[in-house]
Amino acid sequence: NDSMRFRKNIERIGEIMAYELSKTLDYKNIDVQTPLGIKHTTTIAEPVVLCSILRAGLALHQGFMSFFDNAENGFVSAYRHHYDNDDKFEILVEYQAAPSFEGKNLILIDPMLATGQSLVAVLHKLHLEQKPKEIHIAVVIATPEGIEYLEKNVPSNCHLWVAALDEKLNEHNYIVPGLGDAGDLAYGIKL
């Protein structure tokens, strides 16, 4: 397992996704004073908030930060809590540290979209009182089942960005062929 190489590759994917996503945002005209004159240019109209699912989303988040260098940042922990060696699980969202995203572009970052339940649970936790202008969900690998679940359970101002679409979920709700636990691959196996 080469954790650094995995992180760097996920980070690169984040940079590419951030660039492509940036083309869909609204821009406004600004004037920038240079030593020799004024340059008329554009900048993103509404601020960007990057919000990552801990810990798996950190490398992808870093790629987005390289592109959206003025973005505010938020972090949420979400994980599957399995019951007694059963395939049944619930999504627990326990930690949240995020700035206000009222009227801003919220980019929710998680490398894996398996069932979609984690992302929906995080959106419900974040979205209770504040209304972002647009919500963008950025994932590296998704399944058709996860995409379908999101389409049925997210607000209409939500846009999904996927780098690769895998075949399906298996009977344990893991991505097939997938790549394993993104957090473990990036940062080492957890207890």
What is each model feature region?
Residues 1-191:
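PRPP-associated nucleotide enzymes
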